Amino acid sequence: MSDIEQRIKQAVAEQLGMRAEEIKNE
């Protein structure tokens, strides 16, 4: 896996985590 792919996956995981937190707070 390339470095760019790893960074994209990390960014997506962070965004999904943030969305999950937002849904929990509502």
Curated annotation (Swiss-Prot):
Coiled-coil segments on the chain, per record: none
Post-translational modification: 4'-phosphopantetheine is transferred from CoA to a specific serine of apo-ACP by AcpS. This modification is essential for activity because fatty acids are bound in thioester linkage to the sulfhydryl of the prosthetic group.
Alphabetical list of PROSITE patterns matching this protein: CARRIER (PS50075)
Primary site of residence: cytoplasm
Family membership: Belongs to the acyl carrier protein (ACP) family.
Primary role: Carrier of the growing fatty acid chain in fatty acid biosynthesis.
Protein's recorded name: Acyl carrier protein
Organism: Acinetobacter calcoaceticus
